[in-house]
Amino acid sequence: MTQRRRNRHRKRRVGRRAFLIGLGGSVSAALTYYLLRSIPAGNNAEPAPSPQTAPNPALPSGEWRAVWVSYLEFAEMDFSSEAAFRADAAALMDNCLSLGLNTVIAQVRPFGDALYRSSLFPWSHLCTGVQGQDPGFDPLDVLLTEAHARGLSLEAWVNPYRLRSSASMPPVLAENSLLNTHPEWVCTVNEGAYLNPAIPEAADYVVQGVAELVQNYAVDGIHFDDYFYPTTDPSIDAAQFAASGEADLTAWRRTNVTRLVKAAHDAVKAADPTLRFGVSPQGNPDNDRNEQYTDLSVWLTASGADAVVDYLCPQIYWGYGYTLSSGSTRFAFENITAEWLALPRAESTALYFGRGAYRIGVGDGGANADSVSQWCTGSALARQVTDLRSAGAGGWALYRYGSLFRSDESGLAAAERAALTALNG
């Protein structure tokens, strides 16, 4: 990318930031326009509950309001031509804007492949049905154009290690999939295939992929999800651990993951210091530390030249009063968010919260009596937003787009959208 093009993107990012800050105090003309547009609620005709949340008089300044757009959403989009994909992308961005969101997190590397032109990874099978096949246009470029035209930021969501989640996803791997070109970098877990976090060359390749994205596209940031070590099985990296001379497997694995995340962060900042790099870990801090091997204390507290992330967005997909079969309420929404907020954190590191829109009408599986009913009010997500704002959280993200706009629970989803729109207006 030329310096001239980089400068143009930098100026455009400043413009978007000013636009988004403006959303914090009042509804822009563009947002008003989109709110007046009808949003299809799906084919089900059940009446929607009336949202109980009153409009918020003033949005928190700088609040991050995001939605995850996963490979599941892309699987339902029309890639038959650039025009068809652009129409779907435009509708998606319109819907995001109508909710008062300001950030779209688009999963552009779900299986060691790419929804963009890459010299490192094959085209995603989501584009044509065949991994490695060029769709004839650049989906990420289209997404960026449509997002930025509406003042929305777009962060490129990268799954760093996963190449395959099962024998059929993706159905057939391209010849230049890393599973084929570098099988020595890969570990298999059940039917899945993952880059081995203990192999430095594999981590370096992931970082090169991050650099390629931020150098070639006007993304507003890079976003990693919670897929780090795929298993606690000591056999997957036994040879590397033995060669390391270290005594503590858990600590060594945390170092491996942190080395990758730190390098990805630094690659983003080297391309443009104004870009953001964030990670969405599991909501259970114990699982993060001891199963995913994420060193939360380091990630949250490191700053300056030692910074590892710009933000963390733990996935808090439990409702109020969520109760385990043991009787523990540690993971109840009100308790686990307070636990995260109490963790030591550098002033420069933001803390956001991922929330489970997919729980709407279904529930969270808790042992508490209202584990389903509280997700059937039409204002479950808005209630959480209100409480997060009161607690001082910096923002939130919704998993996932389809749960609000393509849900089988169309009546409830419509009510949840209305409640969120009222809060974000």
Report each predicted region and the residues it spans.
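Active-site-adjacent "subsite" loops/lids of carbohydrate-active enzymes
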Residues: 62-64, 68-70, 74-79, 161-212
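Catalytic domains of carbohydrate-active enzymes, especially glycoside hydrolases
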Residues: 88-113
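Aromatic- and acidic-residue-enriched segments that line the glycan-binding/catalytic groove
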Residues: 116-127, 162-189, 227-245, 370-373
